[in-house]
């Protein structure tokens, strides 16, 4: 065709006369004859040949591979529609002929608008093949793209009006967004094919709310058709889908959102960068609890190791920071700080990279992002979700800032405050370490006296952010050695700060070291061994609650949670001490707040003895991270190294740290809830592990009749939405 255009001395194939086109047809026939590929002259034989070719392509390796990639069955049959064609040829001055494609909503925002392409004297999808420059459908499209030739709207306004009207009717009938192929034959519009349109999460929300508002679907249908995880796009900045990406690494999408900034390789460097007004992307092999300040200061986090429930992933989700973990195609240079790619590219401190926590991609340079949007269609849909759900949704929040974010996302309180995270902030780690290294109770109490006002101030912020709502504060949980430095230089510096010899610090650190610390002296065992620690925390909680109530005039609901209980005698001993501290505070302040004492059920034994525990507990909350570890015998921090293989080979249906195991861990939880409620029917039952916003886990909690789930602040809307879907599913099963 290009040769024919050149020979005729014209600019496009539209200008070729009948003789030139006849010569093109003869040339094509000759080429096909040489290949012994001439099509049959008989129409029925042509159809049979076409069907045979389609069947061959469908059953071939390529067709099977494409079906497998989309979750289809390799042996699935082929359905073919044979229909009369509208050719899109034979137009003239009076009427256009040709073919085009049209869409009726923005792929990105879901806003209703007509857009597409039209190619004169064409058939099928030729308008998208780039053989000639097509007309844009509307004036607004033409102006936006700077195209000079008139749009179809300008050449044939009646056609675009008919297209828009057809789109509206079909959307109401199908209750879906779609794209269509159309043909103009002597000016007559014919729709030849419909197919589902590509949609962003924002567009899906807009369509669902529009349809429900117009009555085309019910509100329940609107809630059912949205994937809760797709709501992440509304809660965090996301990368502009049309922006080019220079991909340098791929990992797991541990925490959604996107951020661009200069690379740094230590938590300290991240803090310095943030203090200088140039917050950075923190890249580490993996993170530990002492890195939390650097993670808080960073725009985003990348780790070479780790899984979806690794320390980096959990903390980043709680902070609302984009995070990619397990980026195995990247490595960190040990000689000098640098990030190295599998292709040999090198990125040094200060080089700009982008972290896309939604896709797990690490990208060179800065990439344009879209701001989150919590109004309009999203807000309307969330309102419907809240009207529908039964299950309460609280937030895991460790600071006043976290609690305020959670309140903004309409959390019904705090389901878990991890007090240990507070000790890594500001100048608190030094008195905490002084307390740990103290050789006697008197020195330990002196250090705790220094920490007490800090804890009280923190708790006051939490109560003020959640007036009248429950605030569950977990007493100190991790083993004490986690708060001590590991490097020789840091140990020496700590010794100088505390006036201790380096050998003395090392000796005490060795005394605290354990072979299996996650099953060692942690949780309530720390509170029993060092009662002054829990006594300080309980006093700070109750004093903070009184302060918040008196200063703000708002009700407060403190709930004190004891971690890692496995024997009822542990609870009895600690509850007695908590009540004793409360009486002392009452005597000093001449007032008291109503408080609850509960247990974090994290061991299989605690689940089995939940009836006994319920006699002394006001509430129970399942810590599914540790409960999953102990039920499976898996280390959450190490499981990421083999979990993908287990899931791929079908040993596990999914990562049990990411989505609750209904059959094993879930059965223990149901046993515990039933035994607890048999003793105390009104006992509150919740879940506060990482699975708190996972839709499948939320559905389990709804079916089990739990009272609430708790998740990171930025996932509260997802849990609220999943709870609504679970309520709809449960009601439809009744």
Language model segments and positions:
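Conserved alpha/beta-domain cores
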Residues: 374-377, 384-734
């Amino acid at each position: 065709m290009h040769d024919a255009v050149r020979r005729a001395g014209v600019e496009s194939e539209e200008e070729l006369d009948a003789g030139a086109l006849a010569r093109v047809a003869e040339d094509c026939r000759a080429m096909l004859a040489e290949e012994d590929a001439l099509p049959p002259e008989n129409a029925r034989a042509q159809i049979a040949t076409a069907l045979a070719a389609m069947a061959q392509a469908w059953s071939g390796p390529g067709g099977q591979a494409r079906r497998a990639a989309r979750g289809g069955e390799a042996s699935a049959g082929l359905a073919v529609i044979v229909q009369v064609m509208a050719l899109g040829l034979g137009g003239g001055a009076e009427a256009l002929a040709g073919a085009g494609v049209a869409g009726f909503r923005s792929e990105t925002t879901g806003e209703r608008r007509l857009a597409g392409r039209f190619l004169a004297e064409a058939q099928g999808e030729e308008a998208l093949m780039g053989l000639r420059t097509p007309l844009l459908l509307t004036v607004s499209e033409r102006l936006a793209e700077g195209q000079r030739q008139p749009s179809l709207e300008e050449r044939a306004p009646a056609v675009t009006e008919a297209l828009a009207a057809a789109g509206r009717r079909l959307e109401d009938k199908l209750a879906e967004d779609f794209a269509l192929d159309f043909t103009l034959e002597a000016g007559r519009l014919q729709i030849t094919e419909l197919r589902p349109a590509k949609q962003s999460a924002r567009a899906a929300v807009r369509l669902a709310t529009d349809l429900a508002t117009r009555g085309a679907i019910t509100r329940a249908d609107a809630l059912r058709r949205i994937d809760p995880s797709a709501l992440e796009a509304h809660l965090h900045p996301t990368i502009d889908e049309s922006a080019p990406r220079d991909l340098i690494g791929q990992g797991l999408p541990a925490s959604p959102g996107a951020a661009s900034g200069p690379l740094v390789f230590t938590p300290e460097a991240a803090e310095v960068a943030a203090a200088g007004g140039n917050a950075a992307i923190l890249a580490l092999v993996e993170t530990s609890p002492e890195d939390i300040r650097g993670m808080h200061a960073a725009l985003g986090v990348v780790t070479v190791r780790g899984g979806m429930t690794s320390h980096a992933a959990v903390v980043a989700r709680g902070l609302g920071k984009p995070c990619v973990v397990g980026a195995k195609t990247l490595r960190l240079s040990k000689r000098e700080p640098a990030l190295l790619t599998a292709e040999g590219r090198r990125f040094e401190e200060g080089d700009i990279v982008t972290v896309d926590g939604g896709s797990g991609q690490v990208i060179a340079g800065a990439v344009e992002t879209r701001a989150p949007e919590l109004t309009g269609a999203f807000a309307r849909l969330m309102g419907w979700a809240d009207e529908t759900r039964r299950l309460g949704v609280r937030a895991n929040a460790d600071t006043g800032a976290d609690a305020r974010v959670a309140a903004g996302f309409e959390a019904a309180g705090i389901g878990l405050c991890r007090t240990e995270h507070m000790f890594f902030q500001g100048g608190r780690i030094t008195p905490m370490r002084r307390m740990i290294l103290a050789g006697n109770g008197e020195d330990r109490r002196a250090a705790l006296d220094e920490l007490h006002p800090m804890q009280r101030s923190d708790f006051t912020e939490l109560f003020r952010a959640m007036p009248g709502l429950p605030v569950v504060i977990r007493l100190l949980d991790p083993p004490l050695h986690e708060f001590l430095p590991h490097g020789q230089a840091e140990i020496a510096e700590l010794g100088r700060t505390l006036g201790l010899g380096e050998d003395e610090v090392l000796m005490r650190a060795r005394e605290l070291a354990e072979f299996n610390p996650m099953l060692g002296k942690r949780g309530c065992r720390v509170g029993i061994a060092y009662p002054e620690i829990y006594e300080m925390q309980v006093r700070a909680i109750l004093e903070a609650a009184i302060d918040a109530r008196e200063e703000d005039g708002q009700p407060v609901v403190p709930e004190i949670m004891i971690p890692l209980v496995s024997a009822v005698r542990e609870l009895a001993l600690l509850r007695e001490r908590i009540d004793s501290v409360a009486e002392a505070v009452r005597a000093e302040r001449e007032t008291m707040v109503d408080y609850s004492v509960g247990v974090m059920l994290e061991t299989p034994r605690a689940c089995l003895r939940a009836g006994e525990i319920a006699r002394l507990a006001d509430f129970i909350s399942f810590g599914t991270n540790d409960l999953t570890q102990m039920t499976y015998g898996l280390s959450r921090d190490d499981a990421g190294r083999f979990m993908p293989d287990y899931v791929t080979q079908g040993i596990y249906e999914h990562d049990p740290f990411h989505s609750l195991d209904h059959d094993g861990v879930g059965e223990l939880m149901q046993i515990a809830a039933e035994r607890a409620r048999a003793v105390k029917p009104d006992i509150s039952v919740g879940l506060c592990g990482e699975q708190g916003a996972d839709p499948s886990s939320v559905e389990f909690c709804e079916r089990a009749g739990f009272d609430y789930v708790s998740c990171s602040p930025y996932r509260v809307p997802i849990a609220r939405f999943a709870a609504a879907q679970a309520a709809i599913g449960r009601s439809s099963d009744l």
